[in-house]
Amino acid sequence: MTARGAEVIFIPHASPRGNPEEKHTSWMRHLTARAYDNSVFIVACNQIGENCNGLAFPGNALVIGPGGEVMVKDTRPRASMLLADLKAADLEAVRNHPMRHFFPHRRPDLYFSISEQK
């Protein structure tokens, strides 16, 4: 998505696995890395409560900055709304820093496209 100009990636989840703390721990490991590696804002949320099939969803919501830092989060097991000010200047600061913006240095010539797999 970054290759196509994405600055914000929205990641809605409907994952019943784990409790709010386990979900948050997993997200901190994976989503902060995705934001950092791609120099984008990540906005993620998970369904909360039980659905008609009896699956219980632990909730969770967070916004991560392009440097991988958590800007705002809510790990409480209840419905909520988060507000975050996503500033273009924050995105530019990371993307203009030679030691923090790795995307331009990738080497797609060293690997083939997933679409080329048979």
Where in the sequence are the language-model features?
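CN hydrolase (nitrilase-like) catalytic-core segments centered on the catalytic cysteine
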Residues: 1-81
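Cysteine/selenocysteine-centered motifs that mediate thiol-based redox chemistry or coordinate metal-sulfur cofactors
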Residues: 3, 91-118
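A short, polar/charged loop-to-alpha-helix boundary motif
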Residues: 78-96
